[in-house]
Amino acid sequence: MGKQQDREKIVQEIKVAADLYRKHLVGKRFLYVFEGRYIEVLYKAANFRHLTGVATNLSAKKFYSYAAKKMLQASQIFFTPQHPFSLCKRKIKHIGQIAMLAGSEGFMLEEIVTDTRTYKFGTTDLNFTPCLNKEYDDKGQQKGDCFVVESLRDEDCFSKSRTAYTVTHIFSAPNDAKKYTNLLFLDENATVDGLPDEIKNMLDQTLLHK
């Protein structure tokens, strides 16, 4: 397959991944519970470009917009030694799987250290790992309490993390909701009623006593 065909094929896969990302992740926040602790996670439109691994001159906002609207062109992406075709192909496949990971059994990894940076958390299904950090503005001030996906690793990252925990609960809600309204995953040995009060206070009444 030639380079042009590679780009055309990847662009089609990016469009599919963007559609899944838009339908299942953007505009929502997710609450992951593990060991009685929790973190809140956002999957932002602005992070989509980086997660694909492709090289492009488009801004993060334009890249996602074009992909979601199925307007992205093969001429707008390229591959480099830092953005190889084979890795991009695997990463784009994983983006589509993040939606499933956000509602299924998985592990929470703490303190993931890679060759280039450190991530506070990551969640994995043993095949890939979205790596999470808090978001900061240009002045170094923290932007909100939620974690965002900064990187998508094509590995489980267990060996790169300090500690691994089993995720026991995953909840979601629209960004504008005051409390979490949907239970996406519940470990077979866990209950909602058994959660610490701090977490239960974050849940809509319809989710309590499950």
Which positions does each model-derived feature cover?
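An acidic, glycine-rich, mixed-charge low-complexity segment common to nucleic-acid enzymes
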Residues: 1-117, 122, 172-210
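Compact beta-sheet-dominated globular domain cores
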Residues: 125, 129-190
